[in-house]
């Protein structure tokens, strides 16, 4: 089944709701980066979150990057969505694998760590992108992003993301939701939403039962006039190119390019997001130097 995201509102547009089914997306990330069950769960959660965050943005050319930097062994988690429904990402140490937590679940929180930061970079076409940074709370990713929304954007939010990994290490199911309460919402409605959220043991449990994005939102907001606005296909896709890496070489400046030429070797670049290798020969480096000198 294809991956997709649903965007909806409820209670006369006073509740914004997003839900995602991201199984193939998480599986592709697992295959590209050769992830362990623990790192697959961590990156899969982050990819699901950034995909939902991008769908919440209005401009066609808007971009969002989510960076999670904790003190755990996984290192940095970087995920990007430059287009609606298109995501890519990587983790600093993809080989980390930890024992299950006390609850018998993949220990993403321990892999990420609790000391560190969540940074969200939103590029909406202005001179400078919006950058918001908050401290990590649990390292479980969902709670950390909810804390970001509340602290940095002043929007009370509930965020749930989960990845179910099988015994063979493949992704059985992946998905998540974001529920946001907009200004001037009545207290009794807030209480209803909170009660509905309390009845969810975990996102992975809903996914295990076969819930799709519409089912998840109905489960939480079904009695509050849920209104589905759009469905967006979701996939893992990298937009790297030879041209982009050559632009990065030019940005190093002419002195650095001269050093590369003096070494008399080709330059090999590897994309962090998809592992694709790009080779820039010495003759091409000289051409890039001429461009840098212009």
UniProtKB/Swiss-Prot annotation:
Signal peptide: none annotated. CDD domains: Hsp33. GO terms for molecular function: protein folding chaperone; unfolded protein binding. It comes from the Bacteria. Under oxidizing conditions two disulfide bonds are formed involving the reactive cysteines. Under reducing conditions zinc is bound to the reactive cysteines and the protein is inactive. One of its GO terms (cellular component) is cytoplasm. GO terms for biological process: protein refolding. HAMAP family: HslO. NCBIfam families: PRK00114.1 (NF001033). Belongs to the HSP33 family. This is 33 kDa chaperonin. It comes from Thermoanaerobacter pseudethanolicus (strain ATCC 33223 / 39E).
